[in-house]
Amino acid sequence: MSSGVQGGSAANANAYQTHPLRDAASALGTLSPQAYVDVVSAAQRNFLERMSRLASEQCDAQPVTDDARLDRLDDKPALRAPRSDAAHAADGNARGNGGASGAAKLTELLGVLMSVISASSLDELRQRSDIWNQMSKAAQDNLTSLSDKFQCATDDAKAATDAAERAAAAAKQAAADAKAADAAADAAQKRYDDAMKQGLPDDQLKTLQAALEQAKQQAGDAHARADALQADAAGKLDAATALATQAREWEQQIDDAVNQASRQYGASASLRTPPSPKLSGAAELTAVLGKLQELISSGNVKELESKQKLFTEMQAKREAELQKKSDEYQEQVKKAEEMQKTMGCIGKIVGWVITAVSFAAAAFTGGASLALAAVGLALAVGDEISRATTGVSFMDKLMQPVMDAILKPLMEVISSLITKALVACGVDQQKAELAGAILGAVVTGVALVAAAFVGASAVKAVASKVIDAVAGQLTKLMDSAIGKMLVQLIEKFSEKSGLQALGSRTATAMTRMRRAIGVEAKEDGMLLANRFEKAGTVMNVGNQVSQAAGGIVVGVERAKAMGLLADVKEAMYDIKLLGDLLKQAVESFAEHNRALAQLMQQMSDAGEMQTATGKLILRNARAV
């Protein structure tokens, strides 16, 4: 029995378990061609040695004349019938004649078998070994080429990563320098503002202003340098990312080639490489990608913080400007309202003075003029009462047709001509319209003043239109319920307040005053009345011009207020735009993080594939 029994007792062992070539047979699936040749040659030698040993043992244990015993190769005794002397003699003659024994025949058979096996099996195995070596050589060359390319890509990625690290450090230092320059500029600005508040001499102010300008220039240069270095760092980081991705692709090709070679050639010793004490291949690429991820993450965080700080500062400045513009807008609106109230009060005062002058002039003429003056005084008092009780001025309604039919068309025509002339000269349309409206109102007022001094012949048409418009509107007003109510109100007011008695007493007093100053003739009274009328006309024109000028001033103030309101809206839009930019920066940061997560996932997949390949090789690596 063989002594090579492994795993179990001899009673439970089968023939395969006790066979001396069991271990060699189990390794046939993982051997190279040369190993196959060695295994088969060893099996042949073991077989021939075993057969020769059995033949020698049989030959030594039995005499030569015992043919039956020589035909058996085991240790069992051979039983046979007794033989005669004649048979013994014949057998001896046969041996003497040179007959071959069983051991000799077995040796001859084994020699022929060995010759046949050596001639066929070894030649076939040698051919297969040559084919295997050629295929293995091609696979090794392919793997070597891929490995060289992968190593070059890894080295380039590592160099690019180092360059990106240096660029990031330079950008960080430049950002710190820019921050320091901003602090210096703020300090210079504060010193200059303090000097302005303290009222220092002009020489010191000029020196501080020059220092402030220099600090601002240095801060601007520092920011420009920081932006340039930041852009350079971002470019180098992108280049490093691209090279790392390329190295990852070469690594994937190497993994595919190794897996294909493992499936095709098995875990051959010729495909195995000795372990290296330093990081190589996927491990080195993983280290490079990890460092690259750290750089990208750090750069993204710093970029987001920088943008957030910049946007916050810009937003704070715009909010301060917005508050300032809002305060200025409120101030301009308040000034316009005060100006409008002031001009209204002035107009009322001048109107009452004109009414008084007209009433005084009527005293020298008497008769119908005095009655008209009383009517004018009553209308003025009634207009104030109506404005106080109802909030509506019927005198404004009476003058509205005059404005609509005469003054407004005239102002619009003059304003249109001035606007077209300004636009033809290259002035902006909006500014030309504003200037045309202001100049149109001024020219119209000047034209009315000139017409008043030129004479009645020049304003006859205008006066007729005014009289017709006022008469028609007055007739409609008197026929309406408002007019009737106004008449009743004036009558009651005159009765209660003694306005009629006041009128008669005033006429008597004026007659006495006329006599006292020596105006007895009618011509003298008419002369004084004409002078009073001229003075009233001049004052009325002056009132209208002052009201127009006041309206222009109020319009200018309102235009300034509208400009401030436009600035406020622009500042609000800038604040909204800054918020949108900050939102885009956050989205870009999230996108970069997603890209990094995908890159790390690919690295993890590559490591998992490499681990699976190593496990496959270890499972197929068996001892021969």
Swiss-Prot record:
Superkingdom: Bacteria
Record flagged with keyword Secreted: yes
Record Pfam families: SseC, T3SSipB
Location of the protein in the cell: Secreted; Host membrane
TM stretches of this protein: 359-379, 405-425, 434-454
UniProt keywords, alphabetically: Coiled coil, Host membrane, Membrane, Secreted, Transmembrane, Transmembrane helix, Virulence
Biased composition regions of type Basic and acidic residues, renumbered to the chain: 66-88
InterPro entries: BipB-like_C (IPR006972), IpaB/BipB/SctE_N (IPR032391), T3SS_SctE/BipB (IPR003895)
Sequence segments annotated as region (Disordered): 54-99
Gene3D superfamilies xrefs: Nucleotidyltransferases domain 2
Main location: secreted
GO CC, alphabetical: extracellular region; host cell membrane; membrane
Segments forming a coiled coil: 313-343
UniProt KW Ribonucleoprotein keyword: no
Family: Belongs to the SctE/SipB/YopB family.
Function description: Plays a role in the bacterium-induced formation of multinucleated giant cell (MNGC), which is formed after host cell fusion, as well as in the intercellular spreading of bacteria and in the induction of apoptosis in macrophages. May act in concert with other effector proteins to induce fusion of host cell membranes.
The name this protein goes by in its record: Translocator protein BipB
Organism: Burkholderia thailandensis (strain ATCC 700388 / DSM 13276 / CCUG 48851 / CIP 106301 / E264)
